[in-house]
Amino acid sequence: MHLKWIAYMPMRLGMALLLVASVPAVSAETDDEKPYRIVDGKVDFGTYNGYRRYHNSCHRCHGPDAVGSSFAPSLIESLRKLEEFQFLNIVIHGRIDGRIGGADDDQPIASTSAAGESNVMPAFYKDPNVMEYLDDIYAYAKARSDRAIAPGRPPHLPKEKSD
């Protein structure tokens, strides 16, 4: 079993918390900067990688192209209201009936909404396929929310050495 990444989780969680704590100050200074880059209709490789990771972990609930489903919201709409640090916090800690946190189990206990349906977003802090690429996933979802890219697989620029 490949569990080497678990040894690094305390450090990664600490870094994630530091990121979440520092993002409001950073985002206030850089409101015009986008987490994605598009040149001649092609996205940067990080955003393309976010598309790939989104379809590996997120599309089952949030639908293809982040449009939502009958049991999970459209990320296109959500990211028009959420700041980046809020999005990261929800993905890392999960959400149960609107409350962030508490869904940190691999199989969280579902609460029941007034309609009798559970409303749970699991925490992904244990999933290296999400945690290691969270910035890329956010970049893809934000590009979709901003309508900067169309539905479907986005064409991408070549991978840069720094990516």
Annotate each predicted stretch with a short phrase.
Residues 10-22:
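Bacterial N-terminal signal peptides
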